[in-house]
Amino acid sequence: MKKRTTIRISAFLLCLCCAFFTSCKEDDGKGYVFGYDISSNPGSLDPQYASDRESYLIIGSVFEGLFRIGADGNAEKAMAESYTVSDDGLTYSFKLKQDRYWTDVNGYNKKVTAADFVFGFRRLFLPETRAPKASEYFCIKNSDKINSGEITDLSQLGVTAQGDYSLTIELQYTEPSFAMLLAMPAAMPCNEEYFIKAQGKYGLDAERTASNGPFYVKTWNYDAWSNNNNNLVLRYSDKYNEHDEVTPLGLNFFIEDNHITDFTDGTSQSIVLSGSKAKSYLDKNYIYDEFSTAVYGITMNTSNSIFKSDKLRYALLYATDTAELEMPFGYTVADGAVPPSVKNSLGSYRDVVGSKAVVKPDEIKAYTAYQSACAGIDKADLYSVNIIAVENRDEEIGESVKGILQQWQAKLGMYCSISYISESEYDEKLKNGDYTLALTRLNGSYNCPEAYLNSFTGNVNKYSAMNSDYSKLLEKASQAKDEKEEYELCRQAEKQLISDGRFIPVAYVTEYFISTKNCENIIYDAFTGQVDYRNALYFD
């Protein structure tokens, strides 16, 4: 097997050396090089520009923001030594750690200061950056006006430095999830001097990727035309380790598709699986954490199909009884558009708001609505109704969805089928509105109900956009005075989404982060896909 030969030999020799020098000491689990598979080459390690999960994963190991995601899934202080929030919730004042440095594979060495956060946020909102996550931070004073070009004086942005280690962020409205947002990649610092020297290639190779986190990028090899030795090699940062111990020697990220093979043969020590693929690994030989951070549902195209008819949407909604479905392993019946793992200090969103968004099946209402809808619809259009789904991803839950199609046929006399297509073709059809129904998998990019519900707003508009009332509810939720009000506003929006027949919840997906039993202290964030190895241990 030729794949990754060089890196495997290096790792083997490294392990031999470690074994030789530690043979007389008790194994403390430190100094190991962990392996982990990723499916594609990271698009960019520029935190302000990155948008894919592979990039987020590496950025999470290389950069450190004001906050990070802790083992409990909540935001905890990282670069922030301490902070205060004003009584009105609009001003955040931070004292930064004074012992953090920038480094890279070429030995770059400079202290991280408040100016790096100021520059990072200015880049986030500059129109020319085209940052995909900029709108999520429009709570920051004047950020939206800078992003639109209305304001060109960047000093008016509500992010300012008071000396090297004091930072102030002013908001134009309260944001209950602001600490969580400050842990996301887009909020990472950026050293202006380093960025300028990168000459437009910042974060695109190892030589032009700075690090202020526990690891730096030593090598980054990728050849799109070859399956051999595509990988990123990270090693621990000496400067970071001086003040906060980094227990692994390094991380090897392998870019390939054989995740299960590599996990089984020991090339990687952790893997993320769901459904039947996970079942055989949930035994005493492995340790795992489980998360429910994705939800499947049926989305109706209300912009460019016969499902503009609210009566037809209501017919399918009332004819659907998910309680009667047989679910495959790792899936549970969904009672909303936001999955159970979404939580804040109040607890799980689902536990707090309950299942009030669910519409109870009603065969009489379904049939009445269907007959009324058919009076204004060409039968040829009814016969062409089809659900698009993603091949090699949706087949397991697709078997359960067939049960819904049988319900529609039995209760309404309406026939529908499922077509599995490539993910790229699926995304193109959604973009162009070239579909009637879509089997939709909602994944939130961070731990917040709006991260799911915003999929149906005009801002994101991946799916048919809801009306302005829906968007206003979510806008109010993002500006809520506290988490309780945020949850209540999201509950109202979720109920509107479902009761309007735009989205029929089908199933929550349980995702398993599985590691070999000799691993400890590896933290997985199921929302971003980031893995925190700072304190990871491996015992032979």
Task: Annotate each PLM feature.
Residues 37-87, 210:
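N-terminal lobe/hinge region of extracytoplasmic solute-binding protein
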Residues 81-136, 168, 306:
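Aromatic- and charge-enriched surface segment that lines or borders ligand/interaction sites
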Residues 155, 164-165, 171-246, 255-257:
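Gly/Pro-rich hinge or "lid" segments in bacterial periplasmic/extracellular proteins
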Residues 226-229, 371-441:
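Ligand/substrate-recognition segments at binding pockets and active sites
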Residues 235-240, 287-315, 319, 328, ...:
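A bilobed periplasmic-binding-protein/Venus flytrap-type ligand-binding module shared by bacterial periplasmic
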Residues 317-348, 396-403, 430-540:
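Detector for C-terminal structural segments
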Residues 331-374, 392-398:
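Structural transition elements
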